[in-house]
Structure formats: structure tokens, C-alpha cells
């Protein structure tokens, strides 16, 4: 009978890859871990790690779907080479899979499968050599895709070795230590044993002991900040916001034909609730990061969605038209769905600021002004779609609708002009010159001049309301270039802190659809006039 605990432990350790199915690691959610230049809750670390590895926060594994906490904790508790046999590493690029001889229908592969591939190491070595010759070189094509896969393989190695789990504050210096390299390696033993024998109570008790020990050491981030980030990560406020916006849009559409007044009120409540949820999410990011939430593409997308609804609600408060909400909701919903569903393109992680951005005054004034102008132009885009949609449906939009569009464009131009001037002042302060024809500066100026020309044409009588609506749709393409194109397509200039990759097929599809929409509206308008 004395052999029973030993046999249980041995059998569980031997099949540790399956043990994660029987124990919940939620007791570790608020454990503080240092990663990516900052200290964050373990829950955030787990979800970000699996998202970087696999593209999602849950993946199919061993006959079931496992979430990030389960997988990342399982790797930590086990830290054995068996995890290199699991299909956890994302390879999404079809040309690369064809080049490597991998099954193009699969997206996830094991570390062992990739490391034994004869072609992948050569592509990774070529990418490394390109970077060695020129550290600023921009990888492209198969080299870039292979380099990304190599980074994921390196991340899994670091997780399996235990080096990624930096939860012990140092006595001196800035880097935290993994438990397996701390002076007291017994800290992890009770957790591992409880995990191995599937002892939920013992695991929770050991996790609580580790949390208590960590809180007694320093330096530690404020407990409220860790609790806030954990709540923010679990609440998914932006997801619930777009769901409420979508519901408001549906109610607003249905109320066009019946129960108009009551439907408008319901839509207002739903949109307002979504707005408050989104505001809470943005405020949480501000408190967690200690800065405005506009330092990368993900944050700017959710901020522009927020600004679009904000301007719509302000205009609706004044005019009670329904048009502004009807134009804003599709833009906000599409933006938030994009931010929620494309984590490999729009990185939602909170990162430390690059040196040039470490000035909250200029970050707040310049960047918020520019991005709020994008929001106003996005609202104008939505209102223009409402007007052109009526034409396509065989109705003539009222002059009032075109007046709403004109006022929205005025707000956008004011904000873009202000933001561009403030950007020049900041550039002079940071880089010693007001203007240098940097791609970001150039396209901001092109967008500003394009919208000014659009309003000038309306004032001077070169075109009427219909031309204004067509122009609002086409001019937004210049905003898209300044916002997305410079950062993700050109990838050049001094604004490198906003650079990224991916999403080009989505953007190209959007541009194509807009051109088709404008063409149909033009043809339909000619038919109506005839």
C-alpha cells in the first residue's frame, strides 16, 4: 500500500501531457511575471504566449480544445521535450508550406517536425545573414515567413526550458528570474507534484504560497494594476462593445419602417452601452500602460472606432437624426471585429514605449488629434455610404443628409490640420526639423489637401452633395494610406514604432469593394437623372 502514492506520481509524470486536462490552473492568474519589458499577470502572459505561438488563445490538442492557461502552465510544470512533439507552432503562409513540403491544409506543426525539415533551416539562416549584414533590412517573402516561424520555435524552446517564466524579483539588477534559476529551486516542486498527481487542492495551495512569497519580495507592481489587467483580459470589453453596436445597428435598421421613435431610443441605449464598455476598456489600457492607448495599430484601430461612435453620439445629441449612428456603427463594428479576430496582424499586447514616444504631452496632443481626425473621416465615410446607399436603392437623399456629411468633414479637417501642425512641432523638438517629407508626414499632408479640395469644391459649386459623398468615400483611401499603407506596406521613415506586416489582402479587398460601390452609385445616379 505504501507504493501507491509513488506509483500514482510515476504514472502521472509519465503521462504529464494528459494531466493538464484534469486540473485548472486559474490560481496562478494573478502571479506577476516579467516579459516583453514589463511586469504583467500570468494570465496575460499565457494568452500572449499561445497567441504568438499558435495564432489563437486556444488550440485543438490531444482530442480536445485547450486554452492558453492550460497549455502554457502544462509546459511550465512539465518542461519536458515531449511538448516539442505537440502541434503548437503556427505556419500560416501557403507559399512557405509548399516550399517546405508541408501539408498546405494544416496550420499548426510540432517543433520536431519543423526542426527536421531540410529546407527551413536554410531559409532561416538566409534571413539571419540578411539581418547580420544590415540590421535595418526589411525581410520579405519566404525569408520573412521563415524568420517568423523560427521565432516561434525559439519561443517554444524558451518555454520548455523554463527560462520564459520569470516570476522571481531579483535582489539586484532589472531582470527577474525564472523559478528554475532562483536560489531556492524548491519553490516550484510542490506545484509540479500537485499538477502531476492531478491534486487541484494541493495545486491551489502551492500557487497561493508562491503568490504570497512573491508579494513579500520587491520590486512589485501595484496589486490594483495586476488585478485590473487580469479583469480587463478576462472581460473582453471591446468584443462586448461591438456586439452591442451591432445590436444597435440592427434595431436602427428595423426602426426605419416601423416603431421609429421607440426603435431609435433602443438603438441609442445599446450604442451608448457599447460606448461605455469601450471607454472602460480604453481607460483600463491607459491605467495599465500609463499612457494614451494609441501607440500601435491595434490601439489606433480601437481608438478610431471609439472616436467614430463618440462623434456620432455628439451629433445625434444635437440633431436626433439617426443618420450619424447608422453611418458610424458599421465602421465601429468592422474595426473592432478586425481587432478581435486578427491577432497576428494587430498585436493587442501592451508594450513599453519606444524612446521617441516617451512624452505623454506630445503623444496626447499630436497622436490623439491625428487619430481622432481619422475617426471623424470614418464617420463621414459612413454617412456618405448612407447617402449613396439611398441613391442605389432608388431614392434621392435630402439636402439635410448632405449637410450632415459636410459638418462631419469639417470636424475631420480641423483635427487633421491641428494634428499635422503639432506633429511638426514635436518633430522639431525630437529630431531637430519641422518637416522632412517623411512618408507619414507626406501622406498626412496629401490626405489634408485632398479633404480641403473636397470642401472647396462643394463651397465653390464645382459639385453638389452627391459629389461630396463620392469624394468622402474616395478621400478616405488617402487616410487609409497614411494610417495603414505607410506602416504596413511602405514600412519606411522615422515613424518606425508603428510598423507592422500583414493584412494587405483585406485592405485590397476593401478598396476594391469601395470602388465597385462608387461605380454602382454613379451609374444608378445617372439612371435616376435620366
Q: Where are the regions a protein language model picked out?
A:
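Core alpha-helical transmembrane segments of integral membrane proteins
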Residues: 220-333, 339-342, 349-352
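Hydrophobic cores of alpha-helical transmembrane segments in multi-pass inner/ER membrane proteins
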Residues: 245-249, 302-316, 368-387, 444-458, ...
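Membrane-interfacial loop-to-transmembrane alpha-helix junctions, especially the N-terminal start
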Residues: 261-276, 322-331, 400-413, 464-475, ...
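Hydrophobic membrane-spanning alpha-helices of multi-pass integral membrane proteins
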Residues: 273-279, 303-308, 332, 409-418, ...
Amino acid at each position: 500500500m505504501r507504493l501507491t502514492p509513488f506509483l500514482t506520481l510515476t504514472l502521472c509524470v509519465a503521462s504529464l501531457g494528459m494531466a493538464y486536462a484534469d486540473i485548472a490552473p486559474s490560481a496562478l492568474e494573478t502571479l506577476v511575471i516579467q516579459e516583453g519589458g514589463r511586469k504583467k499577470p500570468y494570465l496575460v502572459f499565457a494568452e500572449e504566449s499561445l497567441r504568438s505561438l499558435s495564432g489563437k488563445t486556444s488550440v485543438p490538442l490531444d482530442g480536445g480544445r485547450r486554452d492558453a492557461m492550460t497549455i502554457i502552465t502544462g509546459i511550465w510544470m512539465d518542461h519536458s521535450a515531449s511538448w516539442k512533439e505537440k502541434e503548437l507552432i503556427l505556419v500560416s503562409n501557403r507559399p512557405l508550406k509548399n516550399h517546405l513540403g508541408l501539408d498546405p491544409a494544416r496550420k499548426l506543426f510540432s517543433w520536431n517536425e519543423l526542426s527536421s525539415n531540410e529546407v527551413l533551416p536554410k531559409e532561416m539562416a538566409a534571413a539571419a545573414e540578411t539581418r547580420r549584414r544590415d540590421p535595418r533590412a526589411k525581410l520579405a517573402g519566404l525569408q520573412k515567413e521563415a524568420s517568423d516561424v523560427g521565432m516561434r520555435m525559439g519561443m517554444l524552446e524558451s518555454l520548455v526550458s523554463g527560462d520564459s517564466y520569470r516570476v522571481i524579483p531579483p535582489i539586484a539588477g532589472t531582470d527577474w528570474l525564472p523559478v528554475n534559476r532562483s536560489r531556492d529551486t524548491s519553490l516550484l516542486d510542490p506545484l509540479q507534484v500537485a499538477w502531476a498527481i492531478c491534486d487541484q487542492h494541493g495545486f491551489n495551495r502551492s500557487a497561493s504560497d508562491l503568490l504570497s512569497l512573491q508579494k513579500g519580495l520587491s520590486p512589485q507592481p501595484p496589486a490594483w494594476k495586476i488585478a485590473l489587467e487580469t479583469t480587463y483580459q478576462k472581460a473582453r470589453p471591446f468584443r462586448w462593445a461591438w456586439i452591442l453596436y451591432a445590436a444597435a445597428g440592427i434595431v436602427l435598421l428595423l426602426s426605419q419602417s416601423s416603431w421609429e421613435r421607440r426603435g431609435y431610443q433602443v438603438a441609442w441605449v445599446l450604442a451608448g452601452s457599447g460606448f461605455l464598455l469601450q471607454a472602460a476598456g480604453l481607460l483600463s489600457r491607459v491605467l495599465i500602460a500609463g499612457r494614451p492607448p494609441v501607440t500601435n495599430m491595434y490601439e489606433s484601430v480601437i481608438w478610431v472606432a471609439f472616436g467614430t461612435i463618440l462623434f456620432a453620439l455628439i451629433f445625434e445629441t444635437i440633431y436626433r437624426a439617426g443618420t450619424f449612428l447608422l453611418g458610424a456603427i458599421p465602421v465601429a463594428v468592422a474595426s473592432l471585429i478586425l481587432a478581435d479576430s486578427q491577432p497576428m496582424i494587430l498585436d493587442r499586447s501592451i508594450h513599453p514605449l519606444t524612446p521617441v514616444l516617451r512624452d505623454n504631452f506630445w503623444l496626447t496632443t499630436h497622436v490623439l488629434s491625428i487619430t481622432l481626425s481619422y475617426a471623424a473621416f470614418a464617420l463621414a465615410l459612413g454617412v456618405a455610404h448612407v447617402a449613396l446607399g439611398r441613391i442605389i436603392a432608388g431614392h434621392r437623399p435630402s439636402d439635410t443628409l448632405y449637410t450632415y456629411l459636410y459638418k462631419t468633414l469639417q470636424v475631420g479637417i480641423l483635427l487633421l490640420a491641428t494634428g499635422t501642425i503639432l506633429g511638426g512641432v514635436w518633430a522639431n523638438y525630437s529630431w531637430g526639423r519641422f518637416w522632412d517629407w517623411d512618408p507619414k508626414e507626406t501622406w498626412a499632408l496629401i490626405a489634408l489637401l485632398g479633404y480641403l479640395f473636397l470642401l472647396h469644391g462643394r463651397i465653390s459649386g464645382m459639385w453638389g452633395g452627391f459629389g461630396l459623398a463620392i469624394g468622402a468615400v474616395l478621400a478616405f483611401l488617402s487616410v487609409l494610406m497614411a494610417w495603414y499603407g505607410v506602416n504596413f506596406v511602405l514600412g519606411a521613415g522615422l515613424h518606425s514604432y508603428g510598423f507592422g506586416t500583414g493584412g494587405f489582402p483585406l485592405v485590397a479587398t476593401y478598396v476594391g469593394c469601395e470602388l465597385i460601390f462608387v461605380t454602382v452609385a454613379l451609374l444608378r445616379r445617372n439612371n435616376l437623372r435620366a
